[in-house]
UniProtKB/Swiss-Prot annotation:
Pfam families: Ribosomal_L4 (PF00573). InterPro entries: Ribosomal_uL4, Ribosomal_uL4-like, Ribosomal_uL4_dom_sf. GO terms for cellular component: ribonucleoprotein complex; ribosome. Keywords: Ribonucleoprotein, Ribosomal protein, RNA-binding, rRNA-binding. Part of the 50S ribosomal subunit. This is Large ribosomal subunit protein uL4. NCBIfam families: rplD_bact. It comes from Trichodesmium erythraeum (strain IMS101). Coiled coil: none annotated. Residues 60-71 have a biased composition (Basic residues). Residues 43-52 have a biased composition (Polar residues).
Length: 212
């Protein structure tokens, strides 16, 4: 269980939020988080890289010159891998890089990773009333008031899609906005700081807290 300070729009402390997620045992936590991260990164690979072998490259059916008598090295095809424009030896072919992992394991890895980042977590009051229209400058100033360097990699977790908040944040280079029901382990681990609204924390707690 972790108690997090809740900050308002001005950056003042106004309360506390409790994060009590189901986490993996200490001896297996690193392994399960690593497996889940590897799964996500592997599943994101397109696997479409492709090269042609000497049998697939067009042309090269005729022997370039006779076997003996020219003084040149023997050659059987202009599409040999030794030649410019020839085939590729052991080059990549389209393949499926995806892995599988049990659903319960993935959820456990995600909740373990999120709770492990509690020291870098900033909980704030809901933003819906603060953005009647998109305003990047106001969001940048608020992030600074919350004690975060705007040059850091930041993940902002919202409970639901809020168009004005999204439009305000999309021009901030290292800010990524995700929804509480779209959490993923890569963004959680890659971020320098995580900002989450009180309602988003409640949603995460509802989904990942004390899961049986």
């Amino acid at each position: 269980m972790v108690d997090c300070v809740v900050k308002n729009w001005q950056g003042e402390e106004v309360g506390q939020a409790t994060l009590n997620l189901r986490v993996a045992k200490e001896e297996s936590a690193a392994h399960i988080v690593h497996r889940s991260l590897r799964l996500q990164m592997a599943n994101n690979r397109q696997g479409t890289a492709s090269t042609k072998t000497r049998s697939e490259v067009r042309g090269g059916g005729r022997k370039p010159w006779r076997q003996k008598g020219t003084g040149r090295a023997r050659a059987g095809s202009i599409r040999s891998p030794l030649w410019r424009g020839g085939g590729v030896i052991f080059g990549p072919k389209p393949r499926d890089y995806s892995h599988k992992m049990n659903r319960k394991e993935k959820r456990l890895a995600l909740s373990t990773a999120f709770q492990s980042r509690s020291e870098d977590l900033i909980v704030i009051e809901d933003l819906s009333e603060q953005f009647t229209k998109p305003k990047t400058k106001e969001l940048v100033q608020a992030i600074t008031r919350w004690g975060i360097d705007i040059q850091a990699k930041i993940v902002l977790v919202l409970p639901e899609k809020q168009e004005n908040v999204y439009l305000s944040g999309r021009n901030i280079a290292k800010l990524k906005i995700i929804l509480a029901n779209n959490l993923n382990i890569y963004d959680i681990l890659a971020a320098d700081k995580i900002i989450a609204t009180v309602t988003a924390i409640a949603k995460i707690q509802e989904v990942y807290g004390n899961e049986t």
